[in-house]
């Protein structure tokens, strides 16, 4: 079965979030189970730099101007690149300029992505024709609309990685992107008087997926649906919306092969974890104390990620003699808030503003608890990395966090199902209470070791996700 993934990021060449990690791993896992998966994405400078040996598949002019379609390979996966420098030849973030202003021609840049995705199902490459076009997030949302407009030559799947980003543009652009005005309708592309690329993906695809079963439920409610609850609950009722959990790329995120950490370890040989903890404490200039419970947080500093909850309850970690290390960047007031914590408690709390891939790996490997107190979290990858590395996730019960972490209670520890710590309400008090429970378990080294073992034995491999997607494709 020939699968075309249509997306706008690919790890490690270009990444702004978890979407890139998924596309860096899922197609490869699908090929390993016998599917024929390829990827289509814009030829951004970072992508061209990483995929240099390409051949021209097609050259044409359309609503977006002059376009060359190239084909190459990366990590054993076939990659199509849309080479249109007037649209994609911009360094840095693929969606906005250095001042965080969205590019004014995004409607055209991502319409072209969807258009080429549909054309690859109708013979644009005479040697390979997609049977399933699998589009990811709003950037690729128009794929399904173009396929619909061509009489549905292939099956279509749309994956929601984050419903908060919808890709809404003025309806005046409709005639510029080659779609008939009849599709601008509440039973079509229209949302709140604008074209919604995200809604297009949901409405016109044969099936949609969310990146966890709980998130697939949550987005049918007004709180999480951003005005799309009617459409989403309808899809759910028809069996056209399902949740499939993301996996972990074990070539990159596994404590026994991780190229970024100084000391490898595995379930049967954990000595390296203690050594990584000492290295991490040294990096952050915190006391190298093996007995101090070390909390780590690697995150965007936003309200979605629950950073404010942590700022208000972090003194609990200090009070109990623990340590807290944070890596991330984001809203200036949150950056300031965590800097102030580190200044107030220099023996217990340390912060690095920014992003550092190598440090993020050391934090996951060297920490004892990884904090993910998100208000909402479609899937979440950091808690999965924590499980893999025996760094117990402390999470809020939402989205993929609810699907992947089992709270440590006396019953669940005894039943060997506990894998971390879970709190329900998005309040500093609830987080504080959960921190207290983590300290209580830390005082029982044998119980802690049991939970850590059970966490590390969880299977969140991409192979598992690849099998679930195959089952979905086969029933379309």
Curated annotation (Swiss-Prot):
Pathway participation: Glycan biosynthesis; glycogen biosynthesis
Top-level taxonomic group: Bacteria
Catalytic activity: [(1->4)-alpha-D-glucosyl](n) + ADP-alpha-D-glucose = [(1->4)-alpha-D-glucosyl](n+1) + ADP + H(+)
Keyword field: Glycogen biosynthesis, Glycosyltransferase, Transferase
TM annotation in the entry: none
Binding site for ADP-alpha-D-glucose: 15
Gene Ontology cellular component list: cytosol
Record GO biological process: glycogen biosynthetic process
UniProt similarity note: Belongs to the glycosyltransferase 1 family. Bacterial/plant glycogen synthase subfamily.
Name of the molecule in the record: Glycogen synthase
Organism: Haemophilus influenzae (strain 86-028NP)
Taxonomy of the source species: Bacteria, Pseudomonadati, Pseudomonadota, Gammaproteobacteria, Pasteurellales
